């Protein structure tokens, strides 16, 4: 396929326009260098917007129920009902923050997009939990590898197999992290392997740029854990169907 015949859907979830006020304009400018057919859908998760069609993109009113993942799922379901497309670019409003800009702004090109499509490859930032944590399982699924979901591209051939982006309806976060959970109860939970449990605690308390005490903010603990599970299950199902990946850090 030639690049001008390729059709791409862009699903952009925004929540905090004050903190990330320039992200959408930077993203739109970055897309101008791509010669394929593009349709941009903005999912506004701030619960204070209406669905509408603007000159450059559609706007859908999101719920923020499961952060960007429910927004992407809503946008993808809408796109499937309205458009024909070959690849999907997923992004949230932090995709140009914390040194992340190069994934889209610097490395995305016509040649790379054709490679993603022709070889049915996932493109994004793929990370591996350090070996020091040992095995990392969620409900018997090996989730040692995980995808940073500020921005990534998936061909429709992969989406047709994995079927969804938001996996939060496949488990109950309140069973995993009840509102009254203690540190001891979480350490002894039956959902995560010991390695994954230890990694999550280290991530929240030491490694994440917005580190916090999870047992002092249970709501954030629940929501952030849901987001991490979604990232890990996305990677798990891509591997399960034997699709190859392109890690932008190695290009």
Predicted segments, located by residue:
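ER/Golgi luminal nucleotide-sugar-dependent glycosyltransferases, focusing on the catalytic module
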Residues: 1-251
